[in-house]
From Swiss-Prot:
Function description: Catalyzes the deamination of cytidine and deoxycytidine into uridine and deoxyuridine, respectively. May play an important role in testicular development and spermatogenesis.
Entries under PROSITE patterns matching the protein: CYT_DCMP_DEAMINASES_1 (PS00903), CYT_DCMP_DEAMINASES_2 (PS51747)
Enzyme nomenclature, EC number: 3.5.4.5
Species assigned in the record: Pongo abelii (Sumatran orangutan)
InterPro entries in the record: APOBEC/CMP_deaminase_Zn-bd, CMP_dCMP_dom, Cytidine_deaminase-like, dCMP_deaminase-rel, Deoxycytidylate_deaminase_dom
Protein name per UniProt: Cytidine and dCMP deaminase domain-containing protein 1
Length: 515
């Protein structure tokens, strides 16, 4: 029972560290996301990167233009079948327990192939977290690069075993090839899923509803139905369960046996596995719903002057929200008992690359934490309610923005558009660091802008010049004078309504796009 024993050992060995520091050595008083679960959730979330869907639609239009809408050409039919059989896949590249790459499949390349192109020999001794078990074509290359460990989500693999196309036996043959590569390679190919710590789901639900983005909506639109958040969360749960779970338990067992996890098909291992997967999907859906596509809210400039300059142009709202959810996930690794903050830095190259993220590439990320290597009792943890200023935390905690800059894996290039996504407004100490690093855009909430608190102030953000600031707010352009319930989409800085027919199928597109 190798795989089952493997999961048990990992769960017991790491359960105590699931509330650990940057170094995994400290235990806190609030539930925290383990690094393994964080990397797993980010891989699932990267599978949903919006740019991939746009590429798929563009490719479909191009193919229809070449072959006609019926696709009666035999070669066209074969290619279409192959693409339906290959599932979109997200990937997180980790080195020394630090994230050095966030990737997803593109129209032409699998996630593992993209990682090899982007990182090359630097993949040596890295850990890779896939949202699906990689195919043999990817596995042989990344194993050859000398990776340390490959973890994957134990559901339908990259070469789908669920689609009708798999009846050709190609998917089963690929699964056998993957198992042979696994058994004869130095890299450890495994499933790393840990049970969430006690009260983690409840904690995420409470903090997601109370986060700056949801609270800004309720304050700006006091007449809005307060159930909108919970309705969107339920929609996301259904959508993600369709994507990341195999609804039929017997079919799930069949897939597990085919991909070499037959020992997980027996209870209690199978029931525990599915429960852990459901809990993580619930957590992901909850966090994703905290930055909702709601009416005319999004990340906008308060004063849209010089909007035509490239560094002042906003990202499409779908991508901005996606990146902010990445930061929200990172915030659940916080060591601050009061306020969890996450930050992620991306940059946009001059031309579209092979990655499913298009021209955008990952630079760095972080969350607020105490210095690396610290133990729980090394530093004070009290906030400004403590009268004795000597035992307050603010002199010792390192903010998320600073950790993102410190542990970045790419240099920030002055000629490129770089952007940081922060779950809360940057404080007066972080603002000059962001500007000094050469970051061109800041995406954040504005609930604390202009406030001065006991130990920290947020006065500089509003006065900051030379960096474009996109804050979560109701669209200031006045375009929301349309029907209040009419959906919207912001593409390339232009706000336009979504046709009713498109709106009705918006949630289904991600599910349909993976087959």
């Amino acid at each position: 029972m190798k795989e089952a024993g493997q999961m048990q050992n990992l769960e017991s060995a790491r359960a105590g560290r699931s509330v650990s520091t940057q170094t995994g050595s400290m235990t806190g008083q609030i539930p925290r996301l383990s690094k393994v679960n964080l990397f797993t959730l980010l891989s699932l979330w990267m599978e949903l990167f919006p740019a991939v869907e746009a590429q798929r639609q563009k490719s479909q239009k191009n193919e229809e233009g070449k072959h006609g809408p019926l696709g009666d050409n035999e070669e066209m039919t074969r290619v279409s079948t192959d693409k339906r059989q290959v599932k979109r896949t997200g990937l997180v590249v980790v080195k020394n327990m630090k994230i050095v790459g966030l990737h997803c499949s593109s129209e032409d390349l699998h996630a593992g192939q993209i990682a090899l192109i982007k990182h090359g020999s630097r993949l040596k001794n890295c850990d890779l977290y896939f949202s699906r078990k990689p195919c043999s074509a990817c596995l042989k290359m990344i194993v050859n690069a000398g990776v340390n460990r490959i973890s994957y989500w134990p559901a339908d693999p990259e070469i789908s075993l669920l689609t009708e196309a798999s009846s050709s036996e190609d998917a089963k043959l690929d699964a056998k090839a993957v198992e042979r590569l696994k058994s004869n390679s130095r890299a450890h190919v495994c499933v790393l899923l840990q049970p969430l710590v006690c009260y983690m789901v409840q904690f995420v639900e409470e903090t997601s509803y109370k986060c700056d983005f949801i609270q800004k909506i309720t304050k700006t639109l006091p007449d809005a139905n307060t159930d909108f958040y919970y309705e969107r969360k339920q929609e996301r749960i259904k959508e993600y369960e369709m994507l990341f779970l195999v609804s039929n338990e017997e079919m799930h067992k069949q897939i597990l046996m085919t991909i070499g996890l037959e020992n997980l098909c027996e209870n209690p291992y199978f029931s525990n596995l599915r429960q852990n997967m459901k809990d993580l999907i619930l957590l992901l859906a909850t966090v994703a719903s905290s930055v909702p596509n709601f009416k005319h809210f999004g990340f906008y400039r308060s004063n849209p002057e010089q909007i035509n300059e490239i560094h002042n142009q906003s990202l499409p709202q779908e991508i901005a929200r996606h990146c902010m959810v990445q930061a929200r996930l990172l915030a659940y690794r916080t060591e601050d008992h009061k306020t969890g903050v996450g930050a992620v830095i991306w940059a946009e190259g001059k031309s579209r690359s092979c990655d499913g993220t298009g021209a955008m590439y990952f630079v760095g990320c972080g969350y607020n934490a105490f210095p690396v290597g610290s133990e729980y009792a090394d530093f004070p943890h009290m906030d400004d309610k403590q009268k004795d200023r000597e035992i307050r935390k603010f002199r010792y905690i390192i903010h998320a923005e600073r950790n993102a800059l410190t542990f970045r894996c790419q240099e920030i290039k002055p000629e490129e558009r770089s952007m940081i996504f922060v779950t809360k407004c940057p404080c007066d100490e972080c603002v000059p660091l962001i500007k000094g690093a050469g970051i061109k855009q800041i995406y954040a909430g504005d609930v604390d802008v202009g406030k001065k608190k006991a130990d920290i102030s947020y006065m500089r953000f509003g006065e900051l010049e030379g960096v474009s600031k996109f804050t979560w707010q109701l669209n200031p352009s006045g375009a929301y004078g349309l029907e209040q319930n009419e959906p919207e989409r912001r593409e390339n800085g232009v706000l336009r309504p979504v046709p009713q027919k498109e709106e009705q199928h918006q949630d289904k597109k991600l599910c349909l796009g993976i087959h």
